[in-house]
A protein has these predicted regions:
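N-terminal subdomain of lithium-sensitive/metallo-dependent phosphomonoesterases centered on the IMPase/IPPase/PAP
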Residues: 1-87, 270-271, 300, 309-317
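An extended, acidic
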Residues: 14, 18, 128, 135-138, ...
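Short secondary-structure capping/junction motifs at helix and strand boundaries
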Residues: 60-66, 111-119, 142
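Structural motif
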Residues: 62-63, 80-82, 101, 120-122, ...
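Acidic, Mg2+-coordinating active-site environments of NTP-dependent enzymes
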Residues: 52, 140-145
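General beta-strand structural signal in soluble alpha/beta enzymes
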Residues: 63-67, 93, 195-198, 216
Length: 317
């Protein structure tokens, strides 16, 4: 199989394996802690087993990096590395909601491989059958349930007040998230819409479908800007700061960008230098993804103002 065929086939294989377990009680059982520090649920283990079964069945000489297992090599000289989040949106998945996807990205296997090295990416809806994939420099594609290609519908909305958007809160101190995002949420909630999906990959694909105009995760910006608040992040992450990891966005950031969206970190900087095989605290990221650059600029300005309203000291912890 070509790299593109491998990425699409693996995405479908994981999706088909996981789908019968959506919303099932056994999927809710916490079974351990992932290499990233996040909680591992029973449904995550089912998804991880699907990865290995596919690689062994297809006899691939490849490495893969996932949330739960870290880096695993198959074959003497792996030609590429797959960056896989078998379920991005585990919490929605165990509840049986739609906001959960399979994420598979392909990059050449090299030391210090980064987000900018991802060549192919695929996102597959688990509850539904839509697929989103992209090749770097080749545009993005949205494949419907019947196999036909759909047209990307990036929203032209430029006003925050009219922009439907998502933000992330898992293990991020909400008392600070609320202050930093207060201006944005107050503006959008009535005439745009504010949503919480617990899946950045799902949210980024909604830019392509025209259901969202923006997705925001400022957790790591707060962690970096306010070192005095680190203990609060440690408490919420059960001893380790939890945030946006490279595997969360390895495929989705490429797909959204190739579709024409504007995707940066929450400072407005490129994410291309993010190391793909590193879940350490220094490699945690933030994100601001929007359907157009004008909205991106306005949201970034509002984020700067919101972060400026925060005064986090050790007494705030």
């Amino acid at each position: 199989m070509t790299p593109q065929e491998t990425v699409l086939a693996l995405t479908r294989h994981i999706r088909d394996t996981v789908r019968p377990h959506l919303g099932a009680w056994h999927g809710r059982q916490i079974s351990g802690t992932a290499a990233s520090g996040d909680a591992t649920f029973g449904i995550d283990e089912i998804a991880e087993e699907a990865i290995v079964s596919f690689i062994e069945r297809e006899k691939l000489s490849i490495a893969y990096y996932s949330e739960d297992k870290g880096l695993i090599e198959f074959g003497a000289a792996p030609e590429a590395v797959l960056i896989i989040d078998p379920i991005d949106g585990t919490r929605p998945a165990i509840a049986g909601f739609e906001a959960c996807v399979v994420s598979v990205a392909w990059a050449d296997y090299a030391p210090d491989v980064t987000l900018g090295d991802v060549r192919f990416g695929c996102i597959g809806e688990i509850k539904n059958d839509d697929l989103f994939w992209a090749a770097r420099g080749g545009g993005a594609h949205w494949i419907g349930p019947n196999g036909g290609e759909k047209i990307a519908r990036l929203l032209p909305i430029q006003e925050i007040a009219k922009a439907p958007l998502t933000f992330e809160v898992v293990a991020r101190p909400f008392e600070w998230i609320g202050v930093a995002l207060g201006e944005i949420i107050d503006a959008s909630s009535m005439t745009g819409g504010c949503f919480l999906f617990n899946s950045t990959a799902f949210s980024l694909t909604r830019l392509m479908t025209g259901q969202l105009a923006a997705t925001i995760d400022i957790g790591n910006r707060l962690l970096r800007d306010f070192p005095a608040g680190r203990e609060r992040f440690l408490a919420l992450g059960f001893g380790r700061p939890i945030g946006l990891f490279a595997y969360d966005i390895a495929a989705a950031a490429l797909i959204a960008s190739e579709a024409g969206a504007t995707v940066t970190d929450a400072y407005g900087n490129s994410l291309d230098g993010t190391r793909l095989l590193d879940t350490g605290e220094p490699n945690l990221q933030s994100i601001l993804g929007t359907s157009n650059p004008v909205l991106h600029e306005k949201l970034l300005e509002a984020l700067d103002r919101g972060v400026g309203r925060l005064h986090i000291t050790e007494e705030n912890e």
